[in-house]
């Protein structure tokens, strides 16, 4: 599941500028915070205004500040701020608009003028600058508010005047919590989402909201505050004053020159667009709005609804989704019938899309064909595959057991997820196949983690973060906790079970090393894996994890994950698995650590071309309703409701068929590439090339879309570290178990243990 829509830079639709950014988060090296249960240490209180220039000699000039309980201002509060009559409190509004007719040149000119006007305002003694797009009209489009505030913020820093004023954004663009977080993170002191307030007022007047306006407004602000707490907590930050201006985001699909000029950084993993495309998209959205207004006037009919484009659910003529009714139906039919030709049809739909959705859709393989008989058999290839971690509790008993049966039959591995496993499954077989999952997960809640659980594992996975919602932890609602799940998790039926965002015994690499050591002592024969989430800097974290003696590292991509993830996290947290695994591989090779660890990756891997994990649920009957947390899954896959579980029509043979089809397709690709084993291509990025666009690309997708795609640069992604070093795992970690007291006691008691 997860986010299966295109990145902003890959979309053929005009994008708001916020969509090019992703949240960063803490993992391993420092802990995330539980913003709900540790709310006592969280604060959105701000003091905004001029900071006196002589901070070592404090006087009344340091006191020209306004205390805000939170940074979300109402229209009334902004009006009060604009009209403060106290001496030394001066406010000015600067328009953030540009001339539509001038395009990119107009946007660039407007940004330059805005920065100089802001500096001049500071020199004139204005300690509150309001950046407002209320002056938008048919000839003037709004400058993206994030671009405007970041440009002014960094310009004032460069001239040494930033602390002499507060920057307040008054914009109709602000709607979601991510928008607010980005504006604050790039320098805004406070925000006023006036358009949202206007929409709330209209909804109340039309009876669409059964509250008065004051209550609706307060509820909206409360939701934004909770969201800001959540986003700050992901990074382990407890106060907005530490978060403001910290730039704890990463841009995906923006050019280095743009980031250097307006955002104070030049790090861009895959390159991307500049002012030309930003201006073009802003003008498109502007023109659409005014065309609609013109049509309303001419027809006398007021448009009450915007089109439902299907950000999360597939809609005809809406946003493109990798999982759509056609791909889901074809895959399910192929696995039920055991029809490989039908699977190839599904793979063609997934791989040969009309337009790219993922970064890997731009890549192709170099070919040097050999006879397929020279390539290792499917039965060997399939053992490289694992399923994603999906807990018993999130999934129904039937679905969870079907995954284990299929993977055990294939000699591959299923994963328990964080909910433990019924101990009866360790010793139970069905059709001669064990029901026990080979990979046992240890998450922050430690549900179901016992010595018996750990000793029955071939791999023990420490889940530090989850791709679809890193830094957030999880919760199994009480209505899904029935008697068997409560027994498995050592809890009480009907009680919600909470996994906190951090492991409270892992606040550093050293703490992780201790947990790995402890788990290895419980089960010396099990491999210890650590699950991380793709983000900028994950390579450095992975290097520390290898030094902490992990045997395996999972890099989880933002596109994978769970149907129970918060919508905002699904869209805006984490990055593509291609970027995360590339950085991890390069960092480990460069530091001579790659030979000590195996790497896995997950996130929308659906075909032999993608290879590996997340499609296993689809083959069991999932129809992507994205209601996993609501206990209302109509297919009986992700529910504990007995009536709905009776609808489950999945069978472990379907999962077997899927993975064998996947292995067969991988084998065919290996033959085309000229390699005999899957291990032979690990780390060899020189085998990947960028696909050429078809000759009629501009005609099919429009020149604007082609310009976006051509702005991408995958050289960092495909960089291969040189030197005499291994590109895959060739050694076994030394877990330093010799001489441990446990071992001495076991040896001393060996005779008594064996004799009973």
Language-model regions: role of each:
Residues 187, 196-199, 224, 228, ...:
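Mobile "lid/hinge" segments at catalytic clefts and subdomain interfaces of large enzymes
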Residues 453-456, 546, 753-754:
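Flexible, charged surface loops at secondary-structure boundaries
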Residues 1-108, 117-121, 125-128, 179-180, ...:
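Flexible, glycine-rich loop/tail regions that form catalytic "lids" or insertion modules at the edges
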Residues 371, 378-379, 483-484, 491, ...:
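Short, flexible segments with low predicted structural confidence
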Residues 407, 519-520, 670:
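Broad structural signal for hydrophobic residues in well-ordered alpha-helices, predominantly aliphatic
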Residues 90-240, 250, 255, 259-261, ...:
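Glycine-rich phosphate/ribose-binding loops and adjacent secondary-structure elements
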Residues 447, 494-496:
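Helix-loop-beta element that forms the nucleotide-linked donor phosphate-binding surface
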């Amino acid at each position: 599941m997860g986010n299966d829509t295109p990145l902003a830079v890959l979309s053929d639709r005009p994008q708001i500028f916020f969509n090019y950014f992703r949240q960063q988060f803490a993992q391993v090296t420092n802990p995330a915070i539980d913003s709900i249960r540790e709310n006592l240490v969280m604060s959105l209180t701000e003091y905004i205004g001029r900071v006196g220039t002589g901070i070592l000699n404090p006087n009344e000039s340091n006191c020209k500040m306004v205390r805000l309980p939170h940074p979300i201002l109402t229209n009334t509060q902004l009006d009060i701020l604009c009209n403060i009559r106290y001496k030394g409190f001066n406010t000015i509004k600067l328009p953030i608009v540009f001339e539509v007719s001038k395009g990119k040149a107009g946007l660039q000119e407007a940004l330059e003028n805005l920065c100089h006007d802001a500096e001049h305002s500071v020199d004139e003694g204005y300690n509150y600058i309001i950046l407002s797009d209320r002056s938008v009209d048919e000839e003037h489009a709004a400058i993206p508010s994030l671009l405007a505030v970041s440009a002014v913020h960094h310009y004032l820093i460069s001239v040494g005047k930033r602390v002499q004023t507060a920057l307040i954004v008054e914009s109709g663009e602000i709607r979601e919590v991510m928008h607010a977080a980005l504006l604050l993170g790039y320098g805004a002191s406070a925000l006023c989402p006036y358009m949202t307030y206007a929409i709330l007022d209209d909804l109340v007047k039309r009876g669409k909201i059964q509250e008065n306006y004051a209550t609706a407004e307060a509820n909206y602000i409360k939701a934004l505050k909770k969201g800001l707490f959540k986003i700050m907590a992901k990074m382990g930050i407890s106060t907005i004053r530490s978060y403001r201006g910290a730039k704890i985001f990463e841009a995906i699909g923006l050019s280095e020159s743009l980031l250097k000029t307006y955002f104070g950084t030049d790090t861009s993993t895959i390159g991307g667009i500049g002012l030309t495309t930003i201006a073009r998209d802003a003008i498109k959205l502007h023109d659409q709005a005014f065309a609609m207004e013109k049509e309303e006037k001419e027809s006398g009919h007021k448009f009450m609804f915007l089109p439902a484009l299907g950000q999360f659910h597939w809609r005809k003529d809406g946003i493109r989704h990798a999982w759509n009714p056609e791909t889901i139906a074809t895959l399910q039919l192929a696995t039920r019938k055991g029809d490989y030709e039908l699977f190839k049809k599904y793979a063609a739909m997934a791989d040969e899309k009309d337009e790219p959705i993922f970064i890997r859709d731009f890549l192709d393989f170099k070919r040097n064909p050999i006879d397929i008989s020279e390539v290792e058999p499917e039965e060997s290839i399939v053992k490289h595959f694992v399923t994603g971690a999906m807990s018993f509790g999130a999934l129904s008993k039937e679905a969870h057991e079907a995954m284990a049966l299929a993977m055990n039959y294939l000699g591959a591995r299923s994963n328990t997820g964080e909910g433990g496993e019924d101990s009866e499954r360790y010793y139970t077989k069905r059709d001669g196949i064990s029901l026990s999952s080979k990979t046992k997960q240890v998450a922050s809640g430690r549900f179901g983690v016992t010595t018996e659980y750990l000793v029955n594992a071939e791999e023990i996975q420490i889940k530090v973060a989850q791709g679809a919602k890193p830094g957030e932890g999880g919760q199994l609602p009480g209505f899904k906790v029935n008697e068997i799940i409560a027994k498995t998790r050592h809890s009480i039926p009907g009680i919600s079970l909470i996994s906190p965002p951090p492991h409270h015994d892992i606040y550093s690499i050293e703490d992780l090393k201790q947990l790995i050591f402890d788990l290895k002592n419980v089960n010396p024969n099990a491999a210890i894996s650590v699950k991380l989430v793709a983000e900028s800097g994950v390579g450095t974290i992975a290097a520390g994890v290898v030094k902490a003696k992990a045997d395996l590292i999972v890099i989880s991509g933002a596109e994978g994950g769970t149907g129970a993830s918060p919508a905002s996290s699904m869209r805006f947290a984490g990055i593509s698995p291609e970027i995360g695994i590339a950085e991890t591989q390069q960092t480990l090779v460069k530091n001579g650590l790659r030979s000590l660890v195996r790497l896995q990756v997950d996130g929308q891997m659906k075909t032999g071309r993608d290879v590996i994990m997340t499609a296993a649920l689809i083959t069991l009957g999932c129809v992507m309703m994205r209601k996993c947390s609501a206990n209302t899954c109509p297919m009986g896959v992700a529910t504990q409701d007995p009536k709905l579980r009776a609808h489950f029509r999945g069978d472990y043979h379907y999962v077997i068929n899927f993975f064998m089809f996947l292995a067969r397709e991988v084998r065919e690709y290996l033959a085309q590439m000229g390699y005999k084993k899957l291990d032979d291509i690990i780390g060899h990025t020189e085998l990947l090339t960028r696909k050429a666009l078809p000759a009629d690309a501009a005609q099919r997708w429009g020149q604007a879309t082609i310009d976006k795609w051509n702005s991408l640069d995958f050289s960092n992604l495909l960089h291969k570290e040189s030197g005499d070093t291994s590109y895959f795992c060739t050694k076994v970690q030394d877990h330093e178990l010799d001489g441990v007291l446990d071992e001495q006691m076991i040896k001393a008691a060996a005779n008594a243990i064996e004799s009973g």
